[in-house]
């Protein structure tokens, strides 16, 4: 499995991300051609790279020269521009996710509907180039999972189209929900909205660099040269091959203290029938020592709102919490096997030195009922014969 780890010790911005990926070995033509697919006048901008250094460390810079004044753009304009382009589906999907997270954050900060969000700096050609360029570079590398370290907040103020705002800018702060941060990097803006959106949209998890075999390192330089540390985003490319499968999920939780067990059982069945990957109840004590249950539902990211609405509709909960999570799974497939009890479906599970079979519950129940055998005995026979 190919992964990227973003070492954001000095922060992250859109241009630093593209620069680090170019430094990692992505051909400049990949980024240039991807941006060239969009409905942007080619005379209005030019792209370039250059070698530079920050505190003695050599790095790549990605530079967008804008020749003309660029209009403000609504979120819908940018989404349509990407969707109607001839970009590969993988690039479109990544770029759309990033811009959606940006628009979502801007809408919340400014109290407007998603469709009315104006992108000022973000809508300019340089930021569109950063996002589409990053999506194209990641797609070219064939990356299957992205991880990142804690992000430095920075301090002070930054000048924006909305005036002088505190660091991190409000949209950046909104995008940092669920992402570990720290305040050790020094003054100035260390994380831009575009940089935060890239990680918020694409990263499967955050924390120390995971165990992997490093296959490449790229360093992308920021525009400014900080006095305290090198203004560089460092990206590690690596391989993980432990027989695991990885994907991204969303965990939805609700605390419920006044719904009957019968209703709760029904809600679990509804969640699973609606496509939830897992659902569980656990006991807890709430305020005033009231006994209650925590409903935990694991879903694919695109199912989040549907399942959250189901929980709010079917229970007495007045709110739910959710957070993104990475999932690590052993490989599995379902096979039919011949046994002395007849044909039985089993899950064949393997990976990272693990190899076992798990009989399908429904098939074992059917055999136990047909033959008048204890269910445990059916399980033992199937496991013994199919595990050989």
Swiss-Prot record:
Family: Belongs to the LarC family.
HAMAP family reported for this sequence: LarC (MF_01074)
Keywords: Nickel
GO molecular function: lyase activity; nickel cation binding
PANTHER family in alphabetical order: NICKEL INSERTION PROTEIN-RELATED, PYRIDINIUM-3,5-BISTHIOCARBOXYLIC ACID MONONUCLEOTIDE NICKEL INSERTION PROTEIN
Stated name of the protein: Putative nickel insertion protein
Presence of the UniProt keyword Repeat in the record: no
Domain of life: Bacteria
Record bears the keyword Nucleotide-binding: no
InterPro entries assigned: Ni_insertion
